[in-house]
Design a protein with these regions (language model features):
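Predominantly extracellular beta-rich ligand-binding scaffolds that present long acidic/polar faces
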Residues: 203-469
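Hydrophobic single-pass membrane-insertion segments
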Residues: 23-35
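N-terminal Sec-pathway targeting helices
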Residues: 2-16
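Extracytoplasmic soluble-region selector
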Residues: 4-7, 32-203
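Intrinsically disordered and other compositionally biased segments
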Residues: 12-14, 28, 42, 57, ...
Length: 469
């Protein structure tokens, strides 16, 4: 009996010890980490109402207990805009609300702008400067008029101030020097008036076919910014196609960042027949493509896709040696106000991408045609993509970023498939196709573009393909 008692006591002690360990572990698990917020985020502005005259500026001070960046917005930026540092710039008579937001809390200030009858005015030669490291610095030009007299900015003793010196600096004579990729404002003041110049600093300003090829040859960078300054004709120029379009998704091998076409057209590209998996950008991830037209883009291999072989919303984290790990990060693509005129030698093609992993497309027009005038085949040719692979197991927060809004695909000869040939992992369930319109005549295409697209960006001439303005 003594032995049994001993065993029972030992077991009881073990249970007590185990309970203590579990209790200790539970305490450790619920202990707040350094990242767990202990105080409620607050923000307050030093004024709740303010009045300005046209061309005046005023800086609102915000106080917050958060270390996050404060986001400033104006409800009516045409009346008064606000910089990233809270500086309000009055533009025209009216009323607006300036809001400062940090996290999920905000505070606001009502701003009234009244008309200024003073005769002094500042006229700027350019209200936006687009710069890159290669383009170098640029001087702000303009005049100051006061009654019947008119002076240059220098003659009027204009002063200059940058809103963010880490993006661009400005000297006493108004010379703006790019420092890093990003956006900022420069304030130009003279005779009691202030005007603003928007400064956009890019990774590269793309002006020629050679520039375009150089852009495609750069390692992918989510922070990259590109701007097209001219129409670019690839006649007699070999296109630098990206060919790493399968397997793991590495930023270094993908097209990333933002590309603003400035309403310009890339034309007359003919792919070398030796290039397989032909597309304009190869693999796109974390890419914003906007305001650009592609005309007479000739694909010479089967399986071609207009914009990209893969449009993705995730990529593999690379290790120190540049090799892919199994960790995935979220980086969706957004395609807006894009025109594509794509010519194919073979069937088995896609209008936009070979495989669509998600992302957003809006106000996109694609004209698909065969080079020999033969018909497109609804069984083998697809309006958007042959495959859809939007993962049902992905983070639910990813789903709202998947949409097709106002995508118009024209196939005058034959027809193209408006759905996916293959879906994986519940794909297609998170993407509605009601925003995709497949048509067979220019009249139908023109009607849809005129009624659905932004008329400030697009123009429609009866009997012709829609055009970006």
């Amino acid at each position: 009996m003594a032995k049994k008692t001993k065993i029972i006591l030992i077991c009881a002690a073990a249970l007590i010890l185990a309970a203590a360990i579990v209790t200790t572990l539970c305490l450790v698990l619920v202990k707040p980490s350094e990242e767990t917020p202990t105080d409620k985020t607050t923000i307050s502005l030093n004024v709740n109402a303010y009045a300005l005259t046209e061309d005046e500026t005023f800086t609102i001070a915000a106080t917050t207990n958060s270390t996050d960046v404060i986001k400033w917005t104006s409800s009516s930026p045409e009346v008064a805009s606000v910089s990233s540092q809270g500086r309000v710039i009055a533009k025209t008579a009216g009323e607006t609300t300036i809001t400062a937001t940090v996290g999920n809390v905000s505070d606001s200030c009502r701003v009234q702008v009244v008309a200024d009858n003073a005769q002094a005015t500042i006229k700027l030669a350019q209200t936006t400067l687009r710069l890159s490291a290669a383009s170098g610095a640029m001087q702000i030009q303009g005049t100051v008029a006061d009654g019947d007299s008119q002076q240059t900015l220098t003659e009027a003793g204009a002063t200059y101030e940058t809103d963010n010196a880490s993006v661009a600096t400005v000297s006493a004579d108004g010379t703006v020097t790019p420092m890093s990729v990003g956006s900022t404002l420069v304030f130009v003041s003279a005779n009691g008036r202030t005007k603003t110049v928007a400064v956009e600093v890019y990774t590269m300003l793309v002006s020629t076919a050679e520039d375009w090829n150089a852009m495609l040859g750069l390692p992918g960078d989510l922070a990259a910014r590109f701007y097209v300054t001219n129409d670019i004709d690839f006649t007699d120029v070999v296109y630098n196609a990206k060919v790493n379009n399968g397997g793991d998704v590495l930023l270094s091998q993908s097209f990333c960042g933002s590309l603003d076409g400035g309403g310009h057209t890339i034309s007359n590209v003919t792919f070398d027949g030796s290039v397989s998996s032909q597309s304009l950008f190869g693999t796109m991830v974390g890419c914003t493509l906007t305001n650009i037209a592609f005309s007479n883009i000739h694909f010479t291999a089967s399986g071609a896709a207009g914009l990209a072989i893969r449009v993705l919303q995730h990529y593999n984290v690379a290790d120190k040696n540049g090799n892919a790990t199994r960790e995935l990060l979220f980086a969706p693509c957004y395609v807006t106000n894009v025109f594509g005129d794509f010519v194919y030698d073979y069937n088995g093609v896609s209008g936009i991408t070979g495989i669509y992993y998600g992302g957003g497309m809006e106000n996109v027009f694609v004209n698909m045609r065969m080079s020999d005038g033969s018909a497109l085949n609804k069984t083998t040719d697809f309006a958007v993509a042959k495959q859809s692979m939007v993962w049902s197991m992905a983070d639910p927060n990813w789903f709202p970023n998947n949409y097709l809004n106002n995508v118009v695909v024209l196939a005058e000869s034959g027809a193209v498939n408006a759905a996916w040939d293959t879906t994986y992992d519940g794909a297609g369930l998170t993407i509605g196709l009601s925003g995709l319109h497949c048509v067979t005549t220019k009249m139908e295409a023109g009607y849809l573009v005129r009624t659905l697209f932004d008329n400030n960006m697009w123009t429609v001439t009866p009997g012709q393909l829609p055009e970006l303005r």
